[in-house]
Amino acid sequence: MAQINCIDGDLSGNLVRISNAIEEATKKLADIILFPESALLGWINPEAFRRASPIPGKESEIICQLARKYKIHICIGLDEKDGDRLYDSAILVDDNGNIILKHRKINVLPELMAPPYSVGEGVQAVQTRFGTIGVMICADSFRDNLLESMQKKKPDLLLIPYGWAAPENAWPAHGQELIKVVKKAAIKINCPVIGTNLIGQVSHGPWTGQIYGGQSVAFDPATNLLLIGKDRDKDLIIISLNLNN
């Protein structure tokens, strides 16, 4: 879990922090690294309508190059431009630098940005050498129907980039709510769930000023393994899992 500091609109700086986290993770022999939601431009940032790229495109190719360079699987949330539409997307890139899965967020919370993100269709999972890996994004994990759809795909691992924010005075307690959400998803789908949050602050829309407080969560229902990232500080959490592949 790469719980990094993401600064809204600081695309080049966020790429530096992403690259540094990947380099550190490979030194710790990680096979897969999971970053937060909208890790390049920031969640609910209307500037993304102008600055985001298609997928595949310029920014996703940089992620693919990093995967090839460091021989690691990367899952990351990226804003995706498709014509006039903007999607809150996530990609899974294999260690050869190929995008093997792209998910577009479905539960986009349209009241938080005008115009809002476009709504994705369906959940997906892909076969890898580690087993079947599914990907959802943040508030997708709130919806029972989406968890049920993912359950039917029988993933061995579910990766969820989060943008988990709350007012400053709600932290650190707000991290307990993320634990509940991740645990519920893991128990419902019957596989380990990894949820990576970021460090930062919402800078646009009605949630302006709210804090992304970290406390990323990994939970394995088979072993009751629970790992939690640092409160309101960057962290790189290494998890060892025996997947059912």
Model segments located where?
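Active-site micro-motifs of SAM-dependent methyltransferase domains
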Residues: 6, 40-41, 143
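A cross-domain feature marking catalytic cores of carbohydrate-active enzymes
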Residues: 37, 78, 137, 162, ...
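Cys-nucleophile CN-hydrolase/nitrilase-fold catalytic domain and related Cys-dependent amidase chemistry
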Residues: 11, 19-96, 102, 165-191
